[in-house]
Amino acid sequence: MTPYEDKTLKDSLQEEKNKLKNMSLKDRLWYIWEYYKIPIIGTVVAVFLIFSIFSAVHNNRFETALSCVILNSQPDSEKDLVSEYFDQGFRQYLGLTDETKIDVDHSMSISFDNSNMTEFTYAELAKLSALISSKELDVMIARKDSIDHFGEMGGFLDLKEVLPPDVFDQVKDQLYEVTNSETGETIACGIKIGNTDFLKKTGLTMNDPILGIISNSTRTDTAVKLIRYVYGL
């Protein structure tokens, strides 16, 4: 690099530094996000993928029975009741061995309102998209807006076709339908679970939770068993 080029680079860096220095915190965050959001998102996705690879290598001796995300929920108890519900209660219900795990992430918070999108929101959406595209996710429990968003893109299985007759007959009035924006087909993308004891037993607070099975899930049988478990069937 020539001295001129080196000086130009230093000048550019100093100019950026001065711009940020003279901005308010709000304007500074907006500027960084507006001009650097692509590398920021790329870095987040790369870190998540690297973490997933290391996690897969570390846990390759374990078999995953089910992977579930619970979106936009708030714990109302200091005790980890979610782990008790899934890793103890549901595990016992399935009769799993110690070599089989249940993955549940209830930390994600996402929004589809463009006016409220932040770098954190983009990062969470990128993480969720990576889970779905890699076929690692089986079940999503979320509010109506999230189920609508992914359901309109064909993100869920039709529960009318997946549920066994004995289960369908008992929960058919709780099915939640969404119309695919491309095909125009309306299917039962999820099942309402707000009328069960799910929120009470998990210690979570969320509005009208709906459970959907991801369309490319590789463990649909276990996902259906989760519906049985939630409804006490």
Show which residues each predicted segment covers.
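N-terminal targeting leaders characterized by basic, low-complexity, disordered sequences
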Residues: 1-10
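Short, membrane-interfacial amphipathic segments enriched in basic
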Residues: 14-26
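Hydrophobic membrane-insertion alpha-helices, especially the h-region
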Residues: 35-57
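Short, well-ordered beta-strand elements
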Residues: 64-74, 102-105
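Extracytoplasmic/periplasmic/luminal assembly and interaction segments
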Residues: 81-137
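Extracytoplasmic "Venus flytrap"/periplasmic binding protein-like
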Residues: 117, 123-182
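A bilobed periplasmic-binding-protein/Venus flytrap-type ligand-binding module shared by bacterial periplasmic
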Residues: 206-218
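Short amphipathic alpha-helical coupling segments at ligand-binding clamshell hinges
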Residues: 218-229
